[in-house]
Design a protein with these regions (language model features):
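C-terminal output helix
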Residues: 84, 97-115
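Hydrophobic/aromatic residues positioned on beta-strands within the core alpha/beta folds
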Residues: 72-78
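Acidic, metal-coordinating helix/loop segments flanking the phosphotransfer/catalytic sites
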Residues: 30-48
């Protein structure tokens, strides 16, 4: 089982993604802002950061940079096509994300199913 930090500012999207990830067998912590996520990244070990590309106080790429320094893999989800060029070295999915597509991408990045 992998542990995922989910960072999504839209409450309904965050709750939906949490359920998808938990149903797939992952342990999930969530945050709505970069500040909340940084606090969690500093205190808990995660296997994957799943972050929205645009957040109220920064970007998912900022968080991915911090996560990468700690050996944590990152997957960015975005609804903004113009952001794709900024993503560069990070894996990404376009919103809206289908549950099977999300779980498949996570399994590919982590190298194994959750359970």
């Amino acid at each position: 089982m992998g542990r995922i930090l989910l960072v999504e500012d839209e409450y309904n999207v965050r709750v939906l993604l949490e359920h998808v990830l938990i149903d797939a067998g992952y342990e999930v912590d969530s945050a709505a802002t970069v500040a909340e996520a940084k606090s969690l990244l500093d205190s808990v070990h995660y296997d994957l950061l799943l972050a929205d590309g645009r957040l109220p106080d920064g970007t998912g790429m900022m968080l991915a940079d911090q996560a990468e320094e700690s050996g944590i893999k990152a997957l960015i989800i975005t609804g903004y096509a113009f952001q794709l060029a900024e993503l560069g070295r990070y894996e990404f999915l376009m919103k809206p994300v289908r549950p099977a597509e999300l779980v498949g991408a996570i399994e590919r990045i982590l190298g194994a199913p959750a359970c």
